[in-house]
C-alpha cells in the first residue's frame, strides 16, 4: 500500500533509533577468532560479563597507540578483554590483570594459553583491586583498563591515573551504564558512583577525556 511506514519490519514495534543502528553496525563490523569466541562462551558459563567485540577492538587500538609495554586491567573476567588488549600490545608487553575471583583468573589463564600467549606476558593477581592497585608503581603503565563493579569506579580512577606514565591512557568500561548515567532521574548508587568517576576525570587537568558510546559506554582519557 502506498504511504505505509516500512521503517519497522515488525508491526507494532518501533523502528530502531539511529544510535541503535550505529551500535549494531559497529558491533557487526568486528569479527572474532575461535579463541575469542570460546572465551566469550566461557564468560557466559561462569556468569561474568565481557566487553563487546567493538569495545574489544577499541581496547586493542588504544593498547597499540599507547605503546602497550605495560598494561593493567581491573576485572579479568573470562579473559575476553585481556585477549583484545594483548592483541594490541607489543610482543614483549606485560598485562597485569586483577580479579577477586580465582575462578575468573583460572578461566582467563586458559584463554591466554590457548591463544599462545606465554606466561611471561601475563601477571594474574587474585585480590581486591583497591588493595592490589596501591602496590603497583606510580607512572609505570601505558594503559589502565577498568571493568569492574561500577560502585568502585571512583577508587579505580584515582589509582589508575596514578599508575599512568605521561601519554598513558585510562579506559573505564560501563561508564554510561547503558545510558542510565545520563538520565537526570537516575540517582541510585551505581549511577552516583559512575558520575563521580566521570567528574574526577573531567576535573583532572592532566587528562584529556572522551566518552565513546560503545557497549555500556567507554570513557577514555590520555594523561599529559
From Swiss-Prot:
Pfam families per record: Methyltransf_3 (PF01596)
Transmembrane segments: none
A molecular function GO annotation: O-methyltransferase activity
UniProtKB keywords: Methyltransferase, S-adenosyl-L-methionine, Transferase
Chain positions covered by the region annotation Disordered: 1-20
Biased composition (Polar residues): 1-11
KW Transmembrane helix (keyword) present: no
Top enzyme class: transferase
Binding site for S-adenosyl-L-methionine: 51, 73, 75-76, 81, 99-100, 149
Keyword presence, Transferase: yes
Signal peptide: none
One GO process term, biological-process aspect: methylation
EC number: 2.1.1.-
Binding site for substrate: 147
Family, per entry: Belongs to the class I-like SAM-binding methyltransferase superfamily. Cation-dependent O-methyltransferase family.
Protein's UniProt name: Putative O-methyltransferase MMAR_4217
Amino acid at each position: 500500500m502506498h504511504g505505509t511506514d516500512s521503517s519497522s519490519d515488525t508491526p507494532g514495534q518501533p523502528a530502531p533509533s539511529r544510535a541503535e543502528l550505529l551500535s549494531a553496525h559497529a558491533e557487526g563490523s568486528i569479527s572474532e577468532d575461535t579463541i575469542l569466541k570460546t572465551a566469550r562462551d566461557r564468560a557466559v558459563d561462569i556468569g561474568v560479563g565481557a566487553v563487546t567485540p567493538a569495545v574489544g577492538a577499541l581496547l586493542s587500538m588504544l593498547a597499540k597507540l599507547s605503546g602497550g609495554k605495560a598494561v593493567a586491567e581491573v576485572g579479568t573476567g573470562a579473559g575476553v578483554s585481556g585477549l583484545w588488549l594483548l592483541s594490541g600490545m607489543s610482543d614483549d608487553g606485560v598485562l597485569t590483570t586483577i580479579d577477586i575471583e580465582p575462578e575468573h583468573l583460572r578461566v582467563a589463564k586458559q584463554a591466554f594459553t590457548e591463544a599462545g600467549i606465554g606466561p611471561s606476558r601475563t601477571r594474574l593477581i587474585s585480590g581486591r583491586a583497591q588493595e592490589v592497585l596501591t602496590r603497583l608503581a606510580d607512572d609505570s603503565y601505558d594503559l589502565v583498563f577498568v571493568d569492574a563493579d561500577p560502585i568502585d569506579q571512583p577508587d579505580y580512577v584515582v589509582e589508575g591515573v596514578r599508575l599512568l606514565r605521561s601519554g598513558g591512557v585510562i579506559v573505564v568500561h560501563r561508564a554510561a551504564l547503558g545510558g542510565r548515567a545520563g538520565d537526570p532521574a537516575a540517582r541510585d548508587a551505581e549511577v552516583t558512583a559512575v558520575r563521580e568517576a566521570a567528574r574526577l576525570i573531567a576535573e583532572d587537568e592532566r587528562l584529556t577525556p572522551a566518552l565513546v558510546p560503545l557497549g555500556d559506554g567507554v570513557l577514555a582519557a590520555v594523561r599529559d
